[in-house]
């Protein structure tokens, strides 16, 4: 049983404790008129969902309020993953499951039972197309969600009385219903071919003549591929009916070891794409693996960054700059509703920055989920309708450095009363404001040579070495960091962290940007894309990391055959 299944069982068990006696004695009772309209839908899942939704419109406990909004969302998730270590296949898994989320809102659009966390009941749904089985799950989940919503509404009304100022924003924005039934997506990957690639790639440390000489320094070598095909079904009492989906694939290599002083080092690399065919070819994957192994050995032999703290210019590659924006910028323009009783606009760092400058004037940022490709590469964050049934919109977030818009779902925030099509949901989770395809663009961008010349000019002007970073790891830790002398000589260093790389750095520290946009696709719970160019910061701190060095292995690794 996978982790998601276990988690869902826990959620279902916990929420079932709250449910009281079921409202209906049998699921066989139907509304004939509603059933006839739902029967026109060809998809058996949508038809069953619509039939049960029509039936649940009569949901009412004696003396209690009737729901003003009910939504059924079913995620049909097919996944595949294969992993190889040290030249042998170690894991291969295929999984198919369906997860249902039922949302019931009590009250009205102005004030309802919802909270900033998002409410709903989650249950596993049958994986076949048995309509009666699905309707039973919908029935019990709706009953539970309704009772939970009644309790939440009562508690919220009591809480609102404690605040002196009245609530200024609606809890839920009204939208026009939309009907769109898109083709079902499926996993499409040559599994045997990829298993062969993974086995070969994970064993290259011991077989390729270019890297075999330092194989004893490689403590792990892992290659993996994974794919997901998610079809999302949604119906609600406003009349929206959707079936839409996406596919995503990643092929990656991860190698690691230790330097002679015990410092742990790694190189993690790969490609992410909307289709398996867009992933790297077998030859490119092999080449990348060898390059990563060589890079790991170079890191092992590289000096530790100077113990003297540094403040000065750092040139970030497009890859690294995209990671910086993913971490520091994007979450803060996704306008999630704050807790009750607060005057904040959103929960992010830019809550009070509306109409203020948050980036240099030369930079503008747009989120355009409707763009599906860039320079021939598929964009994972693209979509046409969000997960709340609102058509996607291109949003100019930052215009010449000034914050002009937030990304908004159907839960309004101050100054933004309607959705701009950015309500997106992870499987089984409530929808929140999330980005789609972020474009960071610069006025008068510089070429790579011009950026390097600008960096060296700053080094000469300040009379000291400067830095350039190619890739970042988690927490924005530099993975490939080079010290650059004023004459242009580069030296790889290790063991560094950035100091004070934060939103203030984005606002005031970027002095130039390149004409080399890098596409960063993220195959997370909500697929997203960020496209950003190289960026030159004029004042970033670089210092030696405070790390507890690990002991080296006590004895040598197994001898390679033929060595």
Stretch-by-stretch model annotation:
Residues 3-4, 283, 421:
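Short alpha-helical segments used as structural interaction elements across diverse proteins
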